[in-house]
Amino acid sequence: MPWILILDSKLYLFFSFDQLSTTMEQFATTLSELAHKLARILSEKMGYKSKYFRETCLPNTCYLRMNRYPACPLSPQVFGLMPHTDSDFLTILHQDEIGGLQLIRDGKWISVKPNPQALIINIGDLFQAWSNGVYKSVEHRVVTNKAKERFSTAFFLCPSYDTEIRSCFEPPVYRRFTFREFRQQVQEDVKNFGYKVGLPRFLVSSH
């Protein structure tokens, strides 16, 4: 859900989840600060100092999502999440001890060893486009577990739909586009082809 809704405690009064509301608010606030700090560090590593992420990624545009993956006897043939890249700037993921997250590297799927005491940071499509390809959005998936259910929580650093994404270096690898345009193209591709095409749609050479 959008982070701004988590800050609205009235959302939880009907369910009497006051303690949950407080915990989620603290968690979302902490992850938001961490995400902005990481975005700043990554951009400064490229020699680019900017308030861009502070100005575009606000509480009403970022998301916190809690995921539950039921046990599945057909595992690993059944995915909890199909292979994809994240359509944001940064994702901060916390997973339990069950495991199931896999990243693709050199054409092979590599399992990420679960560590409940650690956070996983994913570069998203928007950061790849903004950094002009310096940072890469890695394809990942979730495989189910035969015997145990899996839980994870993800924070997505997202801009408003009207935010223009432009490469910060010249010559640009990707053309300028808004977050709304990107999301609409992803949805259209999934509808027409059954999968996300993503950033290749926005390469300068493709237009």
Question: What label would you give each PLM region?
Answer:
Residues M1-F27:
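Non-heme Fe(II)-dependent double-stranded beta-helix
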Residues D18-H207:
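C-terminal flanking tails of non-heme Fe-dependent oxygenases
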